């Protein structure tokens, strides 16, 4: 007997929430950081590739870590191990720029915080 089934074996779960951002991390501050332009012209990236380890971002990192733990230990029911911060950066897109489709293949968890964006995007 042939029983067809669809199994979400390699699905990508998505966790969505809101995080509080320190008011000092404002547009003026974000624009003052050093960036390099992407070669394809789609935007720019902070030179600091571990931006969440910057003391200015300490409270944001704590917020993100809280949600990572909710996801890992609450939603996925991970029983052992501890996540390790590998990279964090800021991507800057100006009008008519967007991030092309891409993967973060070196990560078990990958996420984004949107500091400013139009309604119904991201």
Predicted regions and their residues:
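Non-heme Fe(II)/2-oxoglutarate
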Residues: 1-81, 98
């Amino acid at each position: 007997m042939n029983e067809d089934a669809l199994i979400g074996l390699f699905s990508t779960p998505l966790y969505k929430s809101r995080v509080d951002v320190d008011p000092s991390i404002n547009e003026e501050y974000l624009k003052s950081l050093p960036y390099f332009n992407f070669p394809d012209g789609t935007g720019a990236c902070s030179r600091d590739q571990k931006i969440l380890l910057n003391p200015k971002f300490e409270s944001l990192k704590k917020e993100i870590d809280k949600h990572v733990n909710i996801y890992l230990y609450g939603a996925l029911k991970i029983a052992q191990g501890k996540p390790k911060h590998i990279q964090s950066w800021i991507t800057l897109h100006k009008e008519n720029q967007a991030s092309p489709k891409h993967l973060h293949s070196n990560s078990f968890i990958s996420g984004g915080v949107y500091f400013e964006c139009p309604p119904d995007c991201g």
